[in-house]
């Protein structure tokens, strides 16, 4: 069952990547051929230099969500900022540059295996439409 679910998630993630492949505003994750991504969630990353004036990553999330497609602000890229790390030696003295950037630019989408092809198709259409609206020409 897990193999089937993974294949469905991978197919959904690939569909999202295909929908945005010619849109410079978002960067996809390039997975090396010798690695198999489980696609528990699917991420895209906003390239801020391509944002139209008045647009932000958070506005993209809001617009996609308003059109009925779940969209979130990504991962726990800087978990060390959580209260649990207060007063410990485990928090870095300076924020980690790459972790900060990933946290500030990530878009996270659901690709769980219970989603239908119609739902993934809608997801792709909505993402593409909103990204096109948010992207400089």
Q: Where do the PLM segments sit?
A:
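PLP-dependent aminotransferase class I/II
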Residues: 1-137
């Amino acid at each position: 069952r897990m193999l089937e679910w993974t294949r469905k998630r991978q197919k959904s993630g690939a569909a999202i990547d295909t929908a945005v492949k010619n849109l410079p505003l978002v960067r996809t994750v390039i997975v090396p051929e010798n690695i198999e991504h489980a696609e528990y969630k699917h991420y895209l990353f906003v390239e801020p230099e391509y944002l139209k004036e008045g647009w932000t990553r958070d506005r993209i999330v809001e617009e996609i969500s308003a059109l009925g497609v779940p969209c979130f602000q990504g991962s726990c890229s800087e978990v060390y900022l959580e209260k649990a790390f207060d007063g410990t030696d485990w928090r870095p003295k300076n924020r980690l540059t790459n972790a900060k950037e990933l946290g500030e630019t990530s878009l996270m989408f659901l690709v769980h295996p219970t989603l239908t092809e119609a739902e993934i198709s809608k997801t792709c259409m909505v993402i593409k439409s909103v990204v096109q609206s948010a992207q400089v020409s």
